[in-house]
């Protein structure tokens, strides 16, 4: 478990944090099934994933609040980006977050525990350790507490990123640059 990981934050969907990550990584959250422990009507998973920073997921129960992201098979996960906005959400803003990973709900292990101070923008949580991507079927984000002892939470967006895999990486064949050699790389 890592406490207070290397976290950067910024706001906007076109900000430098997102642009840098999207150069070498791909958003894999679209391949997962998302669920939340509770939600106010009109503020559910759809708003968490709609690429609109004006909408948000809002919990509607006692803490801790959970967001569960389940992939159909094990995935290599590199980064988790969470968008919070203290200026707009005040006591609804999470301040203590736990990230757990595993294959099913019953074998989750906490990998990151972090505390946030008035976050405003994208929070980049790296999930690769010692140059090894996290490999998991299931991610669970738990909001353990909010700023100003707030009860319910707002999260405006969440994105999950994995490595971009090219055909060269997948097959382990080198990429040929010259036409003379490239014409012999496939069989008829």
Swiss-Prot record:
Q: What lineage does the source organism belong to?
A: Eukaryota, Amoebozoa, Evosea, Eumycetozoa, Dictyostelia
- Its GO biological process terms? anaphase-promoting complex-dependent catabolic process; cell division; protein K11-linked ubiquitination
Q: Show where the DOC domain sits.
A: 4-187
Role this protein plays: Component of the anaphase promoting complex/cyclosome (APC/C), a cell cycle-regulated E3 ubiquitin-protein ligase complex that controls progression through mitosis and the G1 phase of the cell cycle.
The text of the family note is: Belongs to the APC10 family.
Its quaternary structure?
The APC/C is composed of at least 13 subunits that stay tightly associated throughout the cell cycle: anapc1, anapc2, anapc3, anapc4, anapc5, anapc6, anapc7, anapc8, anapc10, anapc11, cdc20, cdc26 and cdh1.
Q: Where in the cell is it found?
A: Nucleus
Keyword entries, A-Z: Cell cycle, Cell division, Mitosis, Nucleus, Ubl conjugation pathway
Transferase: is it a keyword of this entry?
Answer: no
Instruction: Give the coiled coil ranges.
Output: none
The name on file for this protein is: Anaphase-promoting complex subunit 10
């Amino acid at each position: 478990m890592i406490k207070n990981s290397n976290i950067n934050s910024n706001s906007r969907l076109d900000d430098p944090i997102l642009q840098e990550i999207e150069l070498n990584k791909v958003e894999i959250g679209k391949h997962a099934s998302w669920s939340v422990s509770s939600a106010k009507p009109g503020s559910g998973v759809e708003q968490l994933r709609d690429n609109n920073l004006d909408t948000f997921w809002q919990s509607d129960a006692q803490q801790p609040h959970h967001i569960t992201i389940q992939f159909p098979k094990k995935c290599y996960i590199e980064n988790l980006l969470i968008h919070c906005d203290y200026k707009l959400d005040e006591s609804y803003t999470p301040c203590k977050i736990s990230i757990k990973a595993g294959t099913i709900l019953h074998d989750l292990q906490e990998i990151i525990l972090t505390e946030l101070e008035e976050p405003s923008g994208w929070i980049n949580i790296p999930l690769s350790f010692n140059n090894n991507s996290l490999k998991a079927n299931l991610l669970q984000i738990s909001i353990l507490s909010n700023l100003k002892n707030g009860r319910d939470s707002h999260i405006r967006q969440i994105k999950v990123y994995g490595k971009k895999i090219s055909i060269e990486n997948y097959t382990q064949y080198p990429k040929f640059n010259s036409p003379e050699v490239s014409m012999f790389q496939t069989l008829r």
